[in-house]
C-alpha cells in the first residue's frame, strides 16, 4: 500500500511538471489535461486521509488508517483510464510543433557530463545513466520496492525529445 500511495503521489507530481512545462513552452492543452488527471489523483488521496496535498498517510510502521471501502476499486478504475490518456498526452505534447521547435537540441547533457557535474535522479537517467535509488540504493525506498519489478525510464541520447521511440511518458 505504501508503494501504491507513493507511486500515485509521484505521478501527481509529474503531471504538474508535465503540464507546467508544456505551458511554459506555449502549449496550453497539455496543462489542462494533466491537471484534470491530477485532480482525480488528489480526490483519491483526500478519500484516504482527508487531505489533497499535504497528506500524512504513510507513517513509521505502516499507515495511519485503513483504506475506505471501495477505494482500491476506484483507484484501479482510475489507473485503467489513466494509462491510455498518458499516451495521448505524450503525443499531444511531443508532436506539438511549438514544443519541438523550442526543445530540439536544447539542454543536451551527455552521461559523462552529468556524472562529472554530480547530477542525480531524473537528470542523470535523462542523460542515459541507468541508476534509480528505488532499485539500486540502500535506503527505506529500496526496501519498500524490494520484490517489485519495474522499468526505469532511461533516455538514450541525453535529451528526451530525441528519444521518440521510448513508449509513453516514461516517468508516469
Predicted regions and their residues:
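Active-site bordering "gate/hinge" segments
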Residues: 1-172
Amino acid at each position: 500500500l505504501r508503494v501504491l500511495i507513493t507511486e500515485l503521489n509521484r505521478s501527481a507530481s509529474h503531471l504538474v511538471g508535465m503540464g507546467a512545462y508544456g505551458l511554459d513552452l506555449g502549449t496550453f492543452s497539455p496543462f489542462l489535461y494533466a491537471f484534470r488527471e491530477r485532480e482525480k489523483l488528489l480526490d483519491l488521496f483526500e478519500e484516504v486521509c482527508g487531505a489533497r496535498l499535504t497528506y500524512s498517510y504513510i507513517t513509521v510502521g505502516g499507515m495511519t488508517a485503513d483504506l475506505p471501502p471501495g477505494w482500491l476499486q476506484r483507484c484501479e478504475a482510475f489507473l485503467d483510464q489513466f494509462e491510455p490518456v498518458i499516451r495521448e498526452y505524450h503525443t499531444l505534447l511531443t508532436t506539438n510543433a511549438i514544443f519541438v521547435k523550442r526543445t530540439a537540441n536544447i539542454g543536451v547533457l551527455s552521461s559523462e557530463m552529468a556524472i562529472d557535474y554530480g547530477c542525480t535522479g531524473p537528470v542523470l537517467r535523462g542523460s542515459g545513466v541507468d541508476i534509480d535509488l528505488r532499485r539500486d540504493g540502500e535506503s527505506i525506498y529500496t526496501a519498500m520496492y524490494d520484490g517489485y519489478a519495474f522499468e526505469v525510464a532511461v533516455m538514450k541520447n541525453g535529451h528526451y525529445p530525441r528519444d521518440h521511440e521510448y513508449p509513453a511518458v516514461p516517468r508516469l
